[in-house]
């Protein structure tokens, strides 16, 4: 009887630890630099417990207007624990050739971007930044173009990914975000 109770107690503790959004996911446990600045942020420490949409961005792409939809999602859901994290990249057809300062200015002036933006990075296989290497190791493809999106749950697990043609305000993306937010809201 004691062994059974001990095993049940151990199982309950293990389940609690596994579901604890405060524990750091290896996917997000890395430091990145804010766009056009010197401040370094540990993604796990800064965003653990939140639903995250990671996006590789570009300023001169046919999909660049998606900044508007990304910002709209961020503003709509941020108070419920949702954040968009943008990572500019010049890996595709030289569509983000500017300096980080130019990219930051473009995002703010053209699309009023308030969601966190980080350093310009490589995203292609073989030269991808550590975050994109980890996303690939978690089962997502490397971006094949600008504005690939990666949805991460509150525990830091990759839930889904979306190609460039799937807009941030598409029913598919919104439904997935709302499901993750509602799951936590119902606890």
Briefly describe each language-model feature range.
Residues 52-55, 85:
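Conserved hydrophobic packing residues within short motifs/helices of P-loop NTPase cores
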Residues 19-25:
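Cleaved targeting-peptide boundary
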Residues 1-4:
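Positively charged n-region of N-terminal signal peptides that target proteins for export
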Residues 130-133, 137-187:
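Thiol-/selenol-based redox modules, centered on thioredoxin-like
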Residues 30-51, 74-77:
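A short beta-strand-turn-helix
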Residues 9-18:
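Hydrophobic h-region of N-terminal signal peptides that target proteins for export
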Residues 56-60:
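Amphipathic alpha-helical repeat scaffolds
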Residues 63-128:
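Structural microenvironment flanking redox-active thiols in thiol-disulfide oxidoreductases
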